[in-house]
C-alpha cells in the first residue's frame, strides 16, 4: 500500500517498530495506546527479525515502519537499503527513529530513501506528540519526491 494512502485509511493504521531497546519498544507501544488514532502496532527486535517478518507469506505490511539505526545483527541502514530494493516493500513509509543527531546519519538515511527522520524524544509526552505528528502527516507531500526541508521532524 502506498504511503500517501495512510490519510485515507479506513481500518487501523499498521505500524511496525524495529528497535533492539526493550524500554524504547515498551514506551513506543504505550504511547500509541494513548494516542487517539486507530493503529495496530507490531514490534521486532532487530534488523534480521524485521526482514524475516516482512518476507513472511501473508505478513501484515506496515503503512509506517519506524526503524532504529543502531541494532545488532543488521543495522537500520542495511535494512533501509534492502527495503528500498525490494519491489514488495519499497513503498512502505520508513521513519528513521534514532538517538543519533549526527548530520552524517541524517544525510545518509535521506539519500538511501527514508521518508522522515526523528530523534527519539527524552520524555513520554514528546514521544506521543511526535508519533501523532508522524501518523497524521500528509504522506503524499512526504513521498512525492524527496525534500530535505521536511525530512527531519521535531517535536
Q: What are these model-predicted stretches?
A:
Residues 71:
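Receiver (REC) domain active-site loop signature in two-component systems and cognate sites
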Residues 126, 131-132, 136-155:
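CheY-like receiver
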Residues 67-68, 98:
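Active-site residues of response regulator receiver
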Residues 43-64, 128:
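Acidic, metal-coordinating helix/loop segments flanking the phosphotransfer/catalytic sites
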Residues 115:
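Short, glycine/charged-rich "phosphate-handling" switch motifs in NTP-dependent
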Residues 120:
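A Lys-centered signature of the CheY-like receiver
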Residues 12-33, 65:
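Conserved acidic segment of CheY-like receiver
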Amino acid at each position: 500500500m502506498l504511503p500517501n494512502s495512510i490519510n485515507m485509511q479506513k481500518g487501523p493504521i499498521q505500524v511496525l517498530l524495529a528497535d533492539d531497546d526493550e524500554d524504547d519498544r515498551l514506551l513506543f507501544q504505550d504511547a500509541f495506546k494513548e494516542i487517539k488514532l486507530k493503529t495496530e502496532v507490531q514490534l521486532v527486535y532487530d534488523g534480521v527479525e524485521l526482514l524475516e517478518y516482512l518476507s513472511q507469506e501473508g505478513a501484515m505490511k506496515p503503512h509506517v515502519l519506524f526503524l532504529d539505526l543502531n541494532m545488532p545483527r543488521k543495522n537500520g541502514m542495511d535494512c533501509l537499503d534492502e527495503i528500498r530494493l525490494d519491489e514488495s516493500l519499497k513503498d512502505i513509509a520508513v521513519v528513521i527513529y534514532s538517538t543519533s543527531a549526527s548530520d552524517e546519519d541524517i544525510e545518509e538515511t535521506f539519500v538511501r530513501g527514508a521518508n522522515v527522520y526523528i530523534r527519539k524524544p527524552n520524555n513520554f509526552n514528546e514521544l506521543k506528540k511526535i508519533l501523532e505528528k508522524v501518523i497524521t502527516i500528509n504522506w503524499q507531500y512526504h513521498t512525492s519526491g524527496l525534500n530535505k526541508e521536511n525530512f527531519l521532524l521535531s517535536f
